[in-house]
């Protein structure tokens, strides 16, 4: 008996677990088994060409009538999602493609009797780095999927490729993606996955960023004002990001063009130290160290981060300085310009960047970071990263230049910021992702734009779908937001279930503390979910921004509960014809969908004992304050208008003895209620539940019977019991005592 590979090319077809995904695969497309990485279900794909070139495009087969979700770069810096069923629907600059088989069910099998052939098969396409070439996918009018390979340097050429694309398949989409990235990691040996990296401490605390509050006009006084006003409302920030505006920069001399001046000259970095705004007034020799000291000693911050571009500043480092900077002019790949034509007239394109010599880039980063570290700074937000791919001409190409800069950056961060203090930003190209060994946090989408009404639903959809891919490399950061804003709750609830950093960019004195207290505990800590927030399995191929019928559901996990967010993101999306985000008409203002307990993909991991859980869940609606018992596979309808949301805590119900059952919910006034539960133990013989709970506020749980008593530490406390729903609530009126992290709670049934 011959066992056929799960992924193979046969008779011109790409066969995935005996299902045809692509037809008409050309003869010059070749495959290599991934078996060297272990018993994996995937193949590497390459192609052979007649001539050495710096760019090649080859069709790898025709895709028709199979649903897909792609992550593509609609801007140089950022990805967004695009769904379709035909090859022609695949955008330029697609860096991740997930295809669903036409047959089978998307529901996971019910236990050991589930048969794989009855389930959907999910195929992951990962365009890779091979040597000095980077690849991406795109579709053409004939529904062919094309593999585009380019070096970004006319002198860096090649004619033969064997490992430019990896294809992997499985029946669990999330595990399939993780396994695919792991196989690529073992092959490339140039990056690490998220779970292998140290997460910086900022992810577990509330923070503030100066950007939308001050933009480039930020000052020391402004920083202190923001910290002070947030703390005054009982939500003290524990980290701050001093964004663009602290560095020493100057414009080039104005260039005359006849009687008219050209566009205003771009700013370039003139030195690694702070500008005059961040020098101490009575002692100019004391620079940014002054505000760092004030932030930590006076306002109790744990972490201070500052912003810089990967090239130093937007216009790079001014040539003639000590780091060998020379002028380079961005050369965009065709796919980027097709998706974002504004690059043709962008100030960077026209005026260029001062690029630090690759031989001196470690010196540049190390001197900058060591200066900041000596001042007490704990980390950096490194922006403008994708620009490196445009500057590789004459330097070995885009991949080589990106690799050199990122190796230097990683080394400097590891040396100077022991908490691994680095946020990668404007960094969605695979050139960087596939060489990232250090950075553990990455901005997940284009910016939060407080003054752009079209952006808000788009933002939530983008961060969720981008996290499917980006979350394998780093913890996605869903960006800052404003707590006083028409979409404040919409954004805030999403940040609460994102699993990433949680921070606002409010102007000093402009805060909604009622909202912030749903996110932040009195000590400045947050209830962070454990994974990247991602769309539920049944939403992966829906189009909740465009199709007019779908709600977006986002799932995440805590230790002992799951969390599920539902969002109406319809009404706006990136337009492939206008090449920008636009509003579009919807048939109805309100949509109805449904949720199930098992929408939380890993909910079984929240059960302390599989023998006491039959799949039933207690589901708590945060906005309505309602508790519902949902049997396995039973669904609950949810109706939302555009830009409305709902958050549900999902908790496995443990069935104990004598028909008694229990499930913890958490701090019910917080968006991610279940994130408060740090310990859970059932003592069935004593009919007792023991929990360790962080924070303070109203605590809730489900019990099929009225508890005999509830004890916090050693004190019996009053509680309320709703016999119709089984909701038990009581007050934790203060934070745990100073030397303890948790409240010890016992519920006797």
Curated annotation (Swiss-Prot):
Protein's name in the database: Probable galactinol--sucrose galactosyltransferase 6
A Pfam short name: Raffinose_syn
Annotated source species: Arabidopsis thaliana (Mouse-ear cress)
MF (Gene Ontology): galactinol-sucrose galactosyltransferase activity
Family per record: Belongs to the glycosyl hydrolases 36 family.
EC number: 2.4.1.82
Lineage summary: Eukaryota, Viridiplantae, Streptophyta, Embryophyta, Tracheophyta
InterPro entries the record matches: Aldolase_TIM (IPR013785), Glycoside_hydrolase_SF (IPR017853), Glycosyl_hydrolases_36 (IPR008811)
Catalytic reactions on record: alpha-D-galactosyl-(1->3)-1D-myo-inositol + sucrose = raffinose + myo-inositol
């Amino acid at each position: 008996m011959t066992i056929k590979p799960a992924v193979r090319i046969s008779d011109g077809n790409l066969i995935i677990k005996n299902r045809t995904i692509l037809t008409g695969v050309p003869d010059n497309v070749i495959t290599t088994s991934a078996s060297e990485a272990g018993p994996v279900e995937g193949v590497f794909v390459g192609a052979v060409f007649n001539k050495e070139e710096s760019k090649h495009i080859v069709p790898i087969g025709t895709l028709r009538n199979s649903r897909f979700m792609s992550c593509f770069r609609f801007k140089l810096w950022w990805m967004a999602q695009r769904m379709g069923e035909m090859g022609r629907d695949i955008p330029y600059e697609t860096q991740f493609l997930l295809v669903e088989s036409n047959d089978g069910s998307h529901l996971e099998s019910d236990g050991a009797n589930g048969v794989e052939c009855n389930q959907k098969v999910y195929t992951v396409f990962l365009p890779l780095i091979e040597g000095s070439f980077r690849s991406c996918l795109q579709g053409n009018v004939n529904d062919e999927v094309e593999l585009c390979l380019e070096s970004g340097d006319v002198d860096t050429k090649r004619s033969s490729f064997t490992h430019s694309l990896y294809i992997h398949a499985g029946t669990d989409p999330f595990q399939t993606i993780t396994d695919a990235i792991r196989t690529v990691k073992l092959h490339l040996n140039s990056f690490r996955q998220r779970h292998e990296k140290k997460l910086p401490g900022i992810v577990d605390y509330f923070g503030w960023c100066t950007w939308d509050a001050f933009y480039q006009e930020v000052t020391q006084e402004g920083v202190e004002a923001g910290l002070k006003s947030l703390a005054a409302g009982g939500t003290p920030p524990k980290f701050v990001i001093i964004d663009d505006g602290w560095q020493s920069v100057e414009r080039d001399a104005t260039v005359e063009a006849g009687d008219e001046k050209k566009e205003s000259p771009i700013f370039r970095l003139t030195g690694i130290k702070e500008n005059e705004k961040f020098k101490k007034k009575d002692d100019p020799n004391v620079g940014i160290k002054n505000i760092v000291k004030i932030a930590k000693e006076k306002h109790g911050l744990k972490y201070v981060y500052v912003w810089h571009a990967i090239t130093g500043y937007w216009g790079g480092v001014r040539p003639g300085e000590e780091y060998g900077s020379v002028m380079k002019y961005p050369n965009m790949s065709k796919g980027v310009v097709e998706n974002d034509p504004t690059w043709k007239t962008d100030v960077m394109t026209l005026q260029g960047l001062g690029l630090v010599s690759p031989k001196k880039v470690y010196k540049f980063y190390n001197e900058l970071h060591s200066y900041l570290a000596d001042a007490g700074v704990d980390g950096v937000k490194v922006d403008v990263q994708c620009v490196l791919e445009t500057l590789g001409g004459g330097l070995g190409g885009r991949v080589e230049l990106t690799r050199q800069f990122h190796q230097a950056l990683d080394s400097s961060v590891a040396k100077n910021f022991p908490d691994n203090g680095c946020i990668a930003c404007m960094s969605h190209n695979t050139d960087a992702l596939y060489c990232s060994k250090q950075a553990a946090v990455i901005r997940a989408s284009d910016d939060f734009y407080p003054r752009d009404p079209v952006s808000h639903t788009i933002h939530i959809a983008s961060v969720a779908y981008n996290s499917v891919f980006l979350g394998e490399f780093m913890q996605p950061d869903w960006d800052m937001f404003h707590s006083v804003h028409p979409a404040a709750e919409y954004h805030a609830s999403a940040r609460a279930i994102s699993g990433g950093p949680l921070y606002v960019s409010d102007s000093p004195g402009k805060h909604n503390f009622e909202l912030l207290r749903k996110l932040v505990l009195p000590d400045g800590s947050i209830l962070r979910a454990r994974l990247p927030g991602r769309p539920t399995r049944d939403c992966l191929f829906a189009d909740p921004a465009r199709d007019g019928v779908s709600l977006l559901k986002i799932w995440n996990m805590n230790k002992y509960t799951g969390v599920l967010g539902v969002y109406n993101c319809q009404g706006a999306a990136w337009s492939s014809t206008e090449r920008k985000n636009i509003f579009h008409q919807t048939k109805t203002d309100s949509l109805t969908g449904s949720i199930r307990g098992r929408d939380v993909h890993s909910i079984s991991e929240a059960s302390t004992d599989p023998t006491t859980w039959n799949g039933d869940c207690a589901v708590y609606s945060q906005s309505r304050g309602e508790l519902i018992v949902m049997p396995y596979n039973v669904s609950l309808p949810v109706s939302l208008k555009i830009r409305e949301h709902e958050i549900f805590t999902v908790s496995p119900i443990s069935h104990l003895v004598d028909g008694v059952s229990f499930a913890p919910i958490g701090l019910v006034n917080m968006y991610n209620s279940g994130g408060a539960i740090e310990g859970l133990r059932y003592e069935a013989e004593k009919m007792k539940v023991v929990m360790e709970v962080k924070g303070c506020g109203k605590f809730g749980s489900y019990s099929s019977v009225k508890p005999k008593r509830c004890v916090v530490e050693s004190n019996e406390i009053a509680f309320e019991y709703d016999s119709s729903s089984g909701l038990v609530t009581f007050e934790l009126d203060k934070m745990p005592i100073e030397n303890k992290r948790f409240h010890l709670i016992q519920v006797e049934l």
